[in-house]
């Protein structure tokens, strides 16, 4: 299963989250997933909220257009982004290699 998929006007991301990182960043491929480092700790949903906010900023969409489809309580998550207005270079490169 690829780390990034296009389904209609949605972008589906299979992510491996690294909480409590020194900075927020899309690290790159990690096996079949895209590794994303975030500064928030994995406590009381803080990491999920922070991840949604970070991805919304990266894809230039409202936070309501980013939803966690699977993996709310774990490090491995599937996230859907509705109608992204911008695609970060790391993810664009992955989409290009998929054809």
From Swiss-Prot:
GO CC terms, sorted: cytoplasm
Gene3D superfamilies: YggU-like
Protein's UniProt name: UPF0235 protein ASA_3628
SUPFAM superfamilies on file: YggU-like
Alphabetical list of HAMAP family matching this protein: UPF0235
Family classification: Belongs to the UPF0235 family.
């Amino acid at each position: 299963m690829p780390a990034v998929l296009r389904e209609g006007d949605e972008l589906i991301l299979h992510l491996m989250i690294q909480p409590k990182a020194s900075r927020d960043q899309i690290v790159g491929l990690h096996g079949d997933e895209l590794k994303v480092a975030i500064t928030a700790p994995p406590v009381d949903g803080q990491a999920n909220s922070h991840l949604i906010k970070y991805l919304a900023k990266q894809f230039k969409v409202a936070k309501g257009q980013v939803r966690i489809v699977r993996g709310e309580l774990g490090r491995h998550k599937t996230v859907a982004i509705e109608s992204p207005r911008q695609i970060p270079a790391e993810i664009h490169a992955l989409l290009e290699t998929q054809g």
